[in-house]
Amino acid sequence: MYQIPKLPLQLDVETKAVLKQLNSANKKLAELKGVALTIPNESILINTLILQEAKESSAVENIITTHDDLYKADAELKSFAVSASTKEVVQYAGALKRGFDLIRNNKILTLSIIKEVQEVLECNKAGFRRLPGTNLKNQRQEVVYTPPQSYDEIVLHMDNLERYINDDSLQDVDPLIKMAIIHHQFESVHPFYDGNGRTGRIVNSLYLVIKELLDLPILYLSRYIIKNKSEYYRLIQSVRDNGNWEEWILFVLKGVEETAEETIVLVKQIKILMQEYKEKMKIVMGKQYSHELLNNLFNHPYTKIDFIIQDLNVSRVTATAYLNKLVSNGLLEKLKLGHSNFYLNTALTQILIEHSPKADDCFEKIESISKMI
């Protein structure tokens, strides 16, 4: 039976193979941090990429929604009937944003913050598990792991994890290696009744920010996990069964490198598209052009009149005129759902869809925008 270790681990985790992969991962992560700074309005990356991460992290748990449904829900289209799965994905995005708001200034990730993230994610205040009976099962419904059952033991391990997250004097090891250890420890403690996997992946994103490896929580680790789902769970269990920390840490470091590279490409594509839109909008809109209008079209894959009114502080008539002019010049597509009009940035949504995992990997068939509406 696996005994959850007290952190730091009493073994050398910086093997030759780990250090080699660590160098590659850190280089790629530093490049992503720099590329992200080329988008001057951080809310664009926060809003668009967090929605992507929310969708993909939820897909790891077989909570599936389409891009189309997710963007409609994000646009708060009242006439759109939101599915239970889409609500859960939107809640994930809200939980990640809430966590980022809580850690961005003091750069500390406490248990109270982790609990609040899970509370937003699951819409309950149950906190850490107090009742026994939680077991982790495989697809054949066989118990493969039993996490701590008593509340006191859970609190003991989580207090230790909190200190390990925030106190680098406990172990002189690179933050990315620590992140791999933290993620495994959180999964093994399994402190909540629900939402442990998704909360753990949010902790990953927030940890990269508090260690200043990224300024924004925009790394796509969930995409890598989806593509390597069976290996992900195999390696988590391999640590418990065989103490195979090296292979697990290598898996995480490779994930950081791979997903950082993919996110770099995505951010660059968004930047290029924004520049193209800026040039076209200056011609189309003339003196009516503003950075706020451009930013709005990239903050929300689906925008609406109310968003324009709010962001630009203009009247409803003016906001409607702006959007209709952009539609008539091919920069947006006007769509109607019930009594609501909304405006789709098709070029942006296409980029985001193309950067999602393949349909077979996340159990989702993504159809064209026109078919989904």
Q: Over which residues does each language-model region extend?
A:
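FIC/Doc superfamily catalytic core
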Residues: M1-I373
